Curated annotation (Swiss-Prot):
A molecular-function term among this protein's GO annotations: FMN binding
The protein, known as: Isopentenyl-diphosphate delta-isomerase
Gene (UniProt): fni
Compartments in which it is found: Cytoplasm
SUPFAM superfamilies linked: FMN-linked oxidoreductases
Main localization (coarse): cytoplasm
Length: 356
């Protein structure tokens, strides 16, 4: 099984880099109008983009969203990302750690990040595996120890699992996560005196307000909305499928999901803890819009993956451009800091207006 997972990780990297896997429909952030300040009353050079997330100070509200791990090629990618986030004082998440839990030889493809950064690093485990594979608090402990994680993302990916040839389909009984997360912090927080925040993470399909209510009840500390508009994992799996009938079936779901902006607005109705916006974040203005409507931080994945394949310097340049654009947008809105941005006025129009 470990070889199958390792090969699948490599296929995912190849498809994401060389195939068209992005949604054709947008994030609906284009339907968010930020309010220009004709006066500004700010000094562009003094704009403060820093935030505190999960007890870590970040230079900007940006994390490199979970991308990869579990293959030798992934080690170099995670290394390049870690170098970049350390340079810029940002955060990152690793890809699903299941491969390394099955095959310990793959652990270094994840743990390499701690050779290059002490910044915020989030672990990653699949929600479905707690049901299908009987994972528990000990599994979480192993994943945390593997990368000295500052938080643990539990990802929900029903669409990908439904289309993936090797998919796990049983998400029934996800309520078991409540006891598992509580037991983890009771057992291991006492030993390390380090409470691990748990993040419910979508991977491109988005969460609804009903989802947010359930996740809040389960005790999650944060929600990463992972809305549609960026990478479509249905598209990624479409390119992997060999059978033509299965391809036709999967093609119907290439545009499925709640757009990122809509998911932010949905989730914040029933969740008052940190919201992370991922899914089609492609500019500093996207970050500003996401935070104005309810996010506390944003994540970027696919553009960083492509840059990381070239090297850490390309990752740094890419994210520096995002930060510069974010600062300029805040300056034009008259926002000196992120708190002011998060409390700024905005206008919702067109299709996004139908979600509120």
């Amino acid at each position: 099984m470990s070889n199958d997972i390792e090969f699948r990780k490599l296929e995912h990297l190849f498809v994401c880099n060389y195939c068209d896997v992005e949604y054709k429909k947008g994030t609906l952030l284009e339907d968010v109008e930020l309010i220009h300040s004709g006066i500004s009353n700010c000094d562009l050079e003094d704009i403060d983009t820093s935030i505190n997330l999960f007890g870590k100070n970040l230079g900007a509200p940006i994390i490199v969203a979970a991308i990869t791990g579990g293959h030798s090629k992934a080690k170099e990618i995670n290394k390049n990302i870690a170098i970049a986030i350390d340079e810029l004082n940002l955060g990152m998440g690793v890809g699903s750690q299941r491969a390394a839990l099955i095959n310990e030889e793959l652990m270094e493809t994840y743990s390499v990040v701690r050779d290059y950064t002490s910044s915020l690093v989030l672990g990653n485990l699949g929600a479905v595996n707690f049901i299908e594979d009987g994972w528990d608090e000990e599994t979480i402990h192993k994943a945390v120890e593997m990368i000295d994680a500052d938080g643990m993302a539990i990802h929900f990916n029903p669409l990908q699992e439904a289309i993936q040839p090797e998919g796990d389909y049983n998400f029934k009984g996800i309520e078991i996560l409540k006891d598992i997360m509580e037991n983890y912090n009771k057992t291991y927080n006492n030993k390390s005196n380090k409470k691990i925040p748990f993040i419910a993470k979508q991977v491109g399909e988005g969460f609804s307000k009903e989802d947010a209510l359930l996740l809040n009840g389960l005790g999650f500390d944060s929600i990463d909305v992972g809305g549609s508009g960026g990478t479509s994992w249905a598209a990624v799996e479409y390119y992997r499928i060999k059978d033509e009938e299965s391809k036709k079936f999967s093609k119907k779901y290439l545009e499925w999901g709640i757009p990122t902006a809509a998911s932010i607005l949905e989730v914040k109705q029933n969740f008052d803890k940190p919201i992370i916006a991922t899914g089609g974040i492609r500019s500093g203005m996207d970050i500003a819009k996401s935070m104005a409507i309810g996010a506390q931080c944003c994540g970027v994945a696919l553009p960083v993956l492509k840059a990381a394949l070239r090297g850490s310097e390309d990752v740094i340049k890419l994210i520096e451009n995002y930060i510069e654009e974010l600062k300029t947008t805040m300056f034009l809105m008259g926002c000196d800091n992120v708190n002011e941005l998060m409390n700024s006025r905005y206008i919702i129009k067109n299709e996004l207006k139908e979600w509120i």
